[in-house]
From Swiss-Prot:
InterPro entries: Ig-like_dom (IPR007110), Ig-like_dom_sf (IPR036179), Ig-like_fold (IPR013783), Ig_sub (IPR003599), Ig_V-set (IPR013106), IgV_Light_Chain (IPR050150). The gene is VPREB3. Pfam families: V-set (PF07686). Residues 21-123 form the Ig-like domain. The lineage of its organism: Eukaryota, Metazoa, Chordata, Craniata, Vertebrata. It comes from Homo sapiens (Human). It comes from the Eukaryota. Disulfide bonds join C40-C115. This is Pre-B lymphocyte protein 3. Expressed in B-cell precursors. Expressed in fetal liver, bone marrow, spleen and lymph node. Belongs to the immunoglobulin superfamily.
Amino acid sequence: MACRCLSFLLMGTFLSVSQTVLAQLDALLVFPGQVAQLSCTLSPQHVTIRDYGVSWYQQRAGSAPRYLLYYRSEEDHHRPADIPDRFSAAKDEAHNACVLTISPVQPEDDADYYCSVGYGFSP
């Protein structure tokens, strides 16, 4: 029986203001039906993720990046109608990060994922 797996390549850095940097994992391997959690970590630690909104983008091979969602808080977030609710985000303030969750992962989710941070919503 063949095993079909998905790989996620995570790229950064979109923000570099006053030596502030976003860091992401290089790669994540998951199987269809599993949960993928992709972290976007803000550093240095004196700059807190609490103060920023995070936008997430997906780029499939051979395609332009596609806006997935924006998350600042439970009260301030946005996901376009054409993006499935399998994609969600939340902040992990203990690790100064925003986490994109894909649940359950589907074969078409095989892509590169990018994050960017800012003070307001801007797809």
